[in-house]
UniProtKB/Swiss-Prot annotation:
CDD domains to which the protein is assigned, alphabetical: TPP_DXS, TPP_PYR_DXS_TK_like
GO CC entries: cytosol
Listed Gene3D superfamilies: 3.40.50.920, 3.40.50.970
GO molecular function ontology, one term from the record: 1-deoxy-D-xylulose-5-phosphate synthase activity
Binding of Mg(2+), residues: D149, N178
Cofactor note: Binds 1 Mg(2+) ion per subunit. Binds 1 thiamine pyrophosphate per subunit.
EC number: 2.2.1.7
Alphabetical list of InterPro entries matching this protein: Dxylulose-5-P_synthase, THDP-binding, Transketo_C/PFOR_II, Transketolase-like_Pyr-bd, Transketolase_C, Transketolase_CS
Name of this protein: 1-deoxy-D-xylulose-5-phosphate synthase
Binding site for thiamine diphosphate: H78, G120, H121, A122, A150, A151, N178, E373
Reaction(s) catalysed by this chain's protein: D-glyceraldehyde 3-phosphate + pyruvate + H(+) = 1-deoxy-D-xylulose 5-phosphate + CO2
Length: 644
């Protein structure tokens, strides 16, 4: 990387600085930004391939439009790294992106006036943009939603398309087609004809002709309609996506998303059109990094501390042990062999949910529906209705989008759909839009729903196998962290688990600690620390949040008046809420100390610091326990303990 290239990015403190650059300098800037993103993500991890693919598009957008006067609305927002570099955030905070003291991995209004919305979920940009366009239709503001091709599998995007009015001006949809999944443009003749037939002057001329034809007495409307159909048919010969014309969007494209000169020209033309436009831009995901271009899905997101040397080949860090998603992926593969009708459904998360092996082994029973969470759940309900076992694998944060589908199509029908809720708990680097800390609260309220969480790898295996026999709607939630392998209590992988039965992990006399899922390990660590103060604790894993083990806890509360609940979930509506309902129903009067995620939004951060921020680190909890219960150190701990 030359000093000339390095000096270009250092001169960019705001998008207005782009106006003074030549086309050659803009191309060098793109090269430098690519190098910067690769270099930073080598240390921090983050979304790689999508950001490498949208650099030239971002440069051209900021060159032609103003992100302070015009409105850039990024769908998902994980592809906004180049946007951050051009809007005054090429700082030390960018070098720590997704980590403590660093920038968010998504757009964030708290960071910059150039970011309009907190983002993280797909498919909402077009709806947000239409709302803004309606409120600003008499102004000079251009509204620019920027969507990837995958967003068009979202029902919300299609609903927004249906709501577009031809009267909107200064409304420009940017379609970043980085997979060529929508269309393939073949041959020089097709390219040249497409450029001519979709030239904005052709669209403008065509609309003027149609408007003039409607003024002909008696026959005007009919002639105009036939003229429009003829125009549409002509376009359909060369246009990869004639459907957009039916939604009042003039189509422009395909456009080479890595040709800055062409992009600037197209954006300048679209800027001056008096009707809504969709610009179809074709980009290469992972552009500039060979291995990411060859496998863009694998390098969509990368972990920290990978090696970017050796001819640009990235070598992801080898994980020391299996994560809960790894265990899930291995288990469903085994279940696929023993349950020949088992289907797995996922909304575009096959790689993250470790379903590639099942997909390869049982391709006819694996269904990736795209970014369509509601459809994934209802589709699964249809499979269950047809008497086939089905697991719908879905991230906790994305399950929010399928709430009505879970209620109406699964629980109300009493169908045995198994929700495998991945990424339950804090999302750390991905931040507030991705924390999986709300699902228990809305699932608890649904009749017929079983909710459980494993504390270890073997319990996850047991729950997955057992859920196929429950014949009821169920949710098995688990985090994306290293799975606890050693579990002396649970030793038989094939042990069947009936809903509503918890387990005592360790017996004590002074206090009862209830840990949810992987927090049982934290509970056992706290138990050991309390022992140094002469305090003995019983540690219990409820396993099931719903149905709750009323019998077990009724017996335990006959011997314990002090209770601690630890869960990596919102304090509203989680395990503690279920426990409080139990207390109210059975009339127990006990002192309860609850550790959960406070009722607020928490941004990204490293695991240790984020746990400390929400009060779920062991040191903070022990201090609160000693203070809350006013424990005084005993001379010697109880010897009636059985630590497992």
């Amino acid at each position: 990387m030359t000093s000339q290239v390095s000096s270009i990015l250092s001169r960019i403190s705001s998008p207005t600085d782009l106006k003074n650059l030549s086309l050659a300098e803009l191309s060098l800037l793109a090269e430098q930004m690519r190098h910067k993103i690769i270099s930073v993500l080598t240390n921090t991890g983050g979304h790689l391939a999508s950001n490498l693919g949208i650099i030239e598009v971002t440069i051209a957008l900021h060159y032609v439009f103003s992100s302070t006067e015009d409105k850039f609305i990024f769908d998902v927002g994980h592809q906004a790294y180049p946007h951050k570099l051009l809007t005054g955030r090429n700082t030390e905070e960018f070098d720590r992106i997704r980590h403590d003291g660093g920038l968010s991995g998504f757009t964030s209004p708290s960071e910059s006036m150039h970011d309009l919305f907190f983002s993280g979920h797909a498919g909402n940009a077009l709806s947000l943009a239409l709302g803004m366009a309606k409120a600003t239709e008499d102004s000079r503001t251009h509204i620019l939603p920027i969507l990837g091709d995958a967003a068009f599998s979202c029902g919300l995007t299609l609903e927004a398309l249906n709501n577009i009015s031809s009267n909107l001006s200064k409304f420009i949809v940017i379609l970043n087609d980085n997979n060529m999944s929508i269309s393939q443009n073949v041959g020089v003749m097709s390219k040249n004809l497409s450029r001519w037939i979709h030239h904005p002057k052709f669209s403008l001329f065509s609309r003027k002709i149609e408007k003039w034809l409607t003024k002909i007495p008696r026959y005007g409307n009919g002639i105009s309609k036939r003229s429009h159909k003829l125009s549409t048919c002509l376009k359909s010969l060369f246009c990869p996506i004639p459907i957009f014309e039916q939604f009042n969007l003039a189509y422009m494209g395909p456009v080479d998303g890595h040709n800055i000169k062409r992009l600037i020209s197209v954006f300048q033309t679209a800027r001056d059109l008096p009707f809504p436009v969709l610009i179809h831009i074709c980009t290469t995901k992972g552009k500039g990094l060979e291995i990411a271009q060859e496998n863009p899905e694998k390098y969509h997101g990368v972990t920290a501390n990978f090696n970017s040397s050796e001819k640009n080949k990235l070598l992801p860090t080898i994980k020391p042990q299996l994560t809960y998603p790894d265990v899930f992926g291995q288990t469903v593969c085994k279940l696929g062999e023993t349950s020949p009708n088992l289907h797995i459904v996922t909304p575009a998360m096959s790689l993250g949910s470790r379903l590639e092996a099942f997909k390869e082994k049982f391709p006819k029973r694996f269904i990736d529906v795209g970014i369509a969470e509601g459809h994934a759940v209802t589709f699964s309900a249809g499979i269950a209705k047809a008497k086939s076992p089905v697991i719908c694998s879905i991230y906790s944060t994305f399950l929010h989008r399928a709430l009505d589908n879970v209620f109406h199509d699964v629980c109300l029908q009493g169908l045995p759909v198994i929700l495998a809720i991945d990424r339950a708990g804090l999302a750390y680097g991905d931040g507030c839009s991705h924390h999986g800390i709300y699902d228990i609260s809305f699932l608890r309220a649904m009749p017929n729903m079983i909710i459980c969480q494993p504390r270890s790898a073997i319990v996850l295996q047991q729950l997955l196998q057992s859920s196929l026999q429950w014949n009821m709607p169920s949710a098995i939630r688990y985090p994306n962290i290293a799975a606890i392998q050693r579990d002396p209590i649970a030793t038989d992988v094939n042990m069947h688990r009936d809903p509503g039965l918890g387990e005592i992990l360790s017996q004590g006399e002074d206090i009862l600690i209830i840990g949810l899922g992987h927090m049982c390990n934290t509970a056992l660590s706290i138990k050991l620390q309390l022992l140094t103060h002469g305090i003995s604790a019983t540690v219990v894993d409820p396993v099931f949040i719903k149905p709750f083990d009323n019998n077990l806890f009724s017996i335990l509360l006959m011997h314990h008046s002090k209770v601690i609940i630890i869960e990596e979930h919102s304090i509203r509506g989680g395990l503690a809420s279920e426990f409080n309902d139990f207390l109210a129903t059975y009339g127990f009067k006990v002192d309860v100390l609850h550790f959960g995620i406070p009722d607020a939004f928490f941004s990204h951060g490293d695991k240790e610091s984020l746990l400390k921020r929400v009060g779920l680190d062991t040191e903070s909890m022990v201090k609160r326990i000693l203070t809350h219960f006013n424990f005084r150190t005993k001379t010697s701990p109880s010897n009636k303990l059985s630590i497992v």
